[in-house]
């Protein structure tokens, strides 16, 4: 793909991964995906939820600072903005340790110089009964919810972009997307690890709905495939990484849960879904249907 670096055009990549429990293996995949995306002209790379490890939240949290520094270095080395999916963190944004032995689910944005631009702590925690191997999910048993919405500033090609940050289950809450738009967001990041069942039912619909609610591009990075745990159990995620335009149309997507050619020695344990935000086209679309000028209940 040719580089797209015109003024007020931002090229983004939603990454689909199949993260397992081995953190070092996952980091190798993340690094390769970032280098690949950068070579294709991407300016913002969005990794999925639990990108560094699936199923080892507390062990991963012990390495939060180290892993964050690694992500910062990946961003700096490739000269891109990196939305580092999510990492479990043992402390709140003010440095206070999370009480009750819980963690925060943290999404971070790193700039091309490696500096951290923003930290968002996932507000809505997944609680559901699902007809899969696990059966029920209660994220609040492990995580404390965040309390603050976050809109971060990106600068590329002499243009400024505002990124509203979300994580996975946040997609089910239109008020968050609307509040981010009201705070100036032009695009929304949604690193996710939807279960196969809930993803099959709602993933695409939720991405399109939140795009319509906010009139923002929505970048849905995703975990996809089977994730094996040390106790012999496993979890299946939906994948289908997708980027949706402000008007709810799907710009680009990966139409599978599984990554292809897993028997090939050259197989990459990730795929990239690239898309371009045309800032002026989005502004014009919002002007043609100014829903936030008409909003009365928010």
Language-model features and meaning:
Residues 64-84, 162, 168-273:
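CN hydrolase (nitrilase-like) catalytic-core segments centered on the catalytic cysteine
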């Amino acid at each position: 793909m040719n580089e797209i670096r015109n003024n007020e055009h931002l090229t983004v990549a939603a990454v689909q991964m199949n993260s397992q429990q081995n953190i070092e293996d996952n980091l190798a995949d993340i690094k390769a995906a970032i280098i690949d995306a950068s070579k294709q002209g991407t300016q913002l790379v969005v990794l999925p939820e639990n990108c560094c490890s699936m199923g080892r939240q507390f062990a991963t949290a012990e390495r939060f600072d180290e892993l964050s520094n690694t992500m910062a270095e990946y961003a700096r080395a490739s000269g891109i903005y990196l939305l580092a999916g999510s990492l479990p963190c043992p402390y709140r944004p003010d440095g206070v340790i999370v009480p009750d032995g819980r963690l925060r689910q943290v999404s971070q944005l790193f700039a091309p110089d490696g500096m951290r631009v923003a930290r968002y702590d996932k507000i809505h925690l997944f609680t559901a009964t699902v007809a899969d191997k696990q059966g029920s999910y209660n994220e609040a048993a492990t995580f404390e919810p965040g309390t603050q919405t976050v809109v971060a500033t990106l600068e590329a090609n002499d243009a400024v972009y505002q990124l509203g940050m979300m994580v996975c289950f946040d997609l089910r809450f239109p008020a968050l997307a609307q509040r981010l738009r009201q705070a100036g967001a032009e695009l929304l990041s949604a690193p996710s690890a939807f279960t196969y069942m809930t993803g099959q039912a709602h993933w695409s619909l939720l991405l399109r709905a939140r795009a319509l609610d906010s009139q923002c591009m929505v970048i849905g990075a995703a975990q996809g495939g089977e994730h094996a745990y040390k106790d012999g159990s496993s979890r299946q995620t939906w994948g289908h990484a997708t980027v949706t335009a402000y008007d709810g149309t799907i710009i680009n997507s990966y139409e599978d849960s599984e990554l292809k050619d897993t028997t090939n020695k050259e197989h990459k344990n990730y795929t990239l879904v690239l898309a371009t935000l045309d800032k002026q086209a989005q502004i014009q679309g919002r002007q043609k249907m100014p829903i936030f000028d008409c909003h009365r209940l928010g």
